[in-house]
A protein has these predicted regions:
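Extracellular beta-propeller repeat domains
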Residues: 1-287
Length: 287
């Protein structure tokens, strides 16, 4: 996952190791003077192997783990920044509630929204909401792996009362989708199905929204040997535009698995492999 900043302190997680063997929550000042391990996951009821980001609200961190919990299908947890232990708000069962969340939570008011990458009634992941006190989880949608998509690995974004996200698989060609759904879960709309051509395929990260335009990356597809794309999608407009196809051979690298960020009139992001050094690249793309 990524780091989050509060004042002069960064918070983050590791997916492995630690005293409990299943990852950690840590803090470090922005000057890097010393790292503090705030919590070590055990892989038991507290969860284990977090792959997403933390969310800070007030004095409380919220997050998810991919594994652990009472059924081994991951948990939603809270952790006070001045505390010593996490509180498990929910343990996924791998049933209709889904299992194995890969992304991060978002917060609106006192409600958390997120996705699981697997299971659910449709067998291909879920969208859910849960109050910050963990009183009850509501499954807003279950992906089927068909035209609606399946197996989301990124996170949701919220605009007004509408959630937007992507799935890695499913859609009309099995190459993933872009979707929207109201926060009440009344109906999911597939905005776009990736074809695996110049538009890309299998998005692994999350979308960002600027004005009425969504930006994101697909981990494969494109015009350059299937090495992924950077794209835009205009809401209620012209649809999807492939902005760039990664070469997998030049300094741009290939297989972007995260999400871009917008700075001024430029998108910045990373690729996971290739590039002259062989380990991926950091890029900037002017809009």
């Amino acid at each position: 996952g990524s780091l989050i900043l509060s004042g002069s302190t960064l918070y983050g997680m590791t997916s492995e190791d630690g005293a409990g063997g299943s990852g950690t929550i840590f803090s470090i000042p922005t000057n890097g003077s010393s790292l503090t391990t705030l919590y070590s996951f055990t892989g038991g009821n507290d969860g284990g192997s977090p792959f997403g980001d933390l969310l800070l609200s007030g004095n409380t961190l919220y997050g998810m783990t991919y594994g652990g919990g009472t059924s081994g299908d991951g948990v939603i947890f809270s952790f006070p920044v001045d505390g010593t232990a996490t509180t498990t708000l929910y343990s996924f069962t791998g049933g209709n509630d889904g299992g194995n969340p890969y992304g991060s939570l978002i917060l609106s008011g006192s409600t958390l929204y997120g996705m699981t990458s697997e299971d659910g009634a449709g067998g291909s992941g879920t969208i859910f909401s849960i109050p910050t006190n963990g009183s009850s989880l509501t499954t807003l949608y279950s992906f089927t792996g068909g035209n609606d998509g399946g197996n989301p690995y990124g996170s949701l974004i919220l605009s007004g009362s509408t959630l937007y996200g992507m799935t890695y698989g499913g859609g009309t060609r099995g190459d993933g989708t872009i979707f929207s759904i109201p926060t009440n879960g009344s109906s999911l709309t597939t905005l776009y199905s990736f074809t695996g051509g110049s538009d890309g395929a299998n998005p692994y990260g999350s979308l960002i929204l600027s004005g009425n335009t969504l930006y994101g990356m697909a981990s494969s597809g494109g015009t350059s040997s299937n090495n992924g794309t950077l794209f835009s999608y205009v809401l209620q407009g012209s649809g999807l535009t492939s902005l760039y196809s990664f070469s997998g051979a030049g300094p741009d690298g290939g297989y972007p698995e995260g999400s871009p960020i917008l700075s001024g009139n430029a998108l910045l992001g990373m690729t996971s492999s290739y590039s002259p050094a062989g380990g991926g690249a950091i890029f900037e793309f002017g809009l």
